Structure formats: structure tokens, C-alpha cells
From Swiss-Prot:
The active site is at residue 77. Its EC number is 3.6.1.9. This is dTTP/UTP pyrophosphatase. GO terms for cellular component: cytoplasm. It catalyses: dTTP + H2O = dTMP + diphosphate + H(+); UTP + H2O = UMP + diphosphate + H(+). Its main location: cytoplasm. Keywords: Cytoplasm, Hydrolase, Nucleotide metabolism. Its cofactor is a divalent metal cation. GO terms for molecular function: dTTP diphosphatase activity; UTP diphosphatase activity. It is found in: Cytoplasm. Transmembrane segments: none annotated.
Length: 193
């Protein structure tokens, strides 16, 4: 379906198993390149979708010297935006528990910034999904944190895991964005290249 991409070697710059799964599901041939320590900090003045867009651009800049002449680099960053602040990946068990407590019974936004970068140009976009959690009790939160892998996920949860099954009341927008890559929007952007 994306024959226009034949002129590119697609490079996904991500360690995320969910992003790899989604790219594979899209049916696009790609390779993965990762750098060990890409800085994911951002200026305190940024708000909402500005944050993951900034980080996705910074990730692309870190890979700039590695981009070959025929390569199309895909970088992305996902945050949970809740009550006026960004929730990234938790720094430990207690942080994960506190994040999930703060999301319990409330709505938040999952925002992913994506950059498509070649040696000649860059196109970036963001996707926003509204998610509402049911009220989670302390046992449910502790069970999830202790039996699943919240530490590599923005907001301390994976919608495709147990917490998503029992905790997510509603989603407005892309489910796959909540997983870490707005794959439908990415497909549309790739189709226009």
C-alpha cells in the first residue's frame, strides 16, 4: 500500500517493543537503530503536545549524523498529560503507584509527538487521545505495578495490559496512540510523502 516508500529505507529509532509491534502491523519494512542515552529532558516552559514534539525532534537530532542518503528516520515520544503536567516514565515503584493513584477516576490525555526525518527535510506531528480511568483501589494499583511492567511506560501504564482491561473506562481518539504510536496518523503521513 505504501509503494511510495520504496525509495526509502525506513529506520525506527526506538527501543519500544510496542512501537516495533505497531510498525510491523503496518506492514512496512523497517530496521531499528537505537542510541544508548538520548536526552529526553525538555524546557519547563513547554506545555502539552509541545513536550513530545520537542523530544521527538531532539531524538531525530541525535540520530542526524547516522541518517543515510536513502533513509527515512521515525522518532517518537509519548507523554501522559494530566492536570497541567506531563507524566513520563516512572522512576521507581512508588512513583508508578503515585502516578496511577493520580489517574484513578479521572481523565487524562496521551500525547505522542512523531518526527519523520531525512537528510533533506523533517515533518513532525502530534496525536492526542483522551483516556478516562475508572476508580482503582490500592490493591489493584499495587497488583499492576508488581506484576506488569509500568516502568517503561509514560504514565506508568500500558493500555494493552491488565490495567487497561480493568481500569480504562473510555478512550476518545487513537487506541494505538495510547500504546505509543498513532499508527493510523503515521500511515496517512507516510502515504503523503
Amino acid at each position: 500500500m505504501l509503494a511510495n516508500l520504496d525509495r526509502y529505507k525506513i529506520v525506527l529509532a526506538s527501543n519500544s517493543p510496542r512501537r516495533k509491534e505497531l510498525m510491523t502491523g503496518l506492514g512496512v519494512d523497517y530496521v531499528v537503530k537505537t542510541l544508548p542515552d538520548v536526552d529526553e529532558s525538555y524546557p519547563d516552559t513547554l506545555q502539552g503536545e509541545e513536550i513530545p514534539l520537542f523530544i521527538a525532534r531532539e531524538k531525530a537530532a541525535a540520530y542526524q549524523s547516522m541518517i543515510g542518503p536513502e533513509e527515512l528516520l521515525i522518532t517518537a515520544d509519548t507523554i501522559v498529560w494530566h492536570e497541567g503536567k506531563a507524566l513520563g516514565k516512572p522512576v521507581g515503584r512508588q512513583d508508578a503507584i503515585e502516578m496511577l493513584r493520580s489517574l484513578s477516576g479521572k481523565s487524562h490525555q496521551v500525547i505522542t509527538g512523531v518526527c519523520l526525518t531525512t537528510r533533506e527535510w523533517q515533518k513532525c506531528f502530534a496525536a492526542v487521545t483522551d483516556v478516562r480511568f475508572a476508580i482503582l483501589d490500592e490493591d489493584e494499583i499495587a497488583y499492576y505495578v508488581d506484576h506488569y511492567q509500568p516502568m517503561d511506560k509514560a504514565g506508568s501504564y500500558g493500555v494493552q495490559e491488565w490495567i487497561g482491561f480493568v481500569g480504562v473506562e473510555s478512550i476518545s481518539g487513537s487506541y494505538f496512540n495510547v500504546m505509543g504510536l498513532p499508527i493510523q496518523k503515521l500511515y496517512r503521513e507516510l502515504k503523503q510523502l
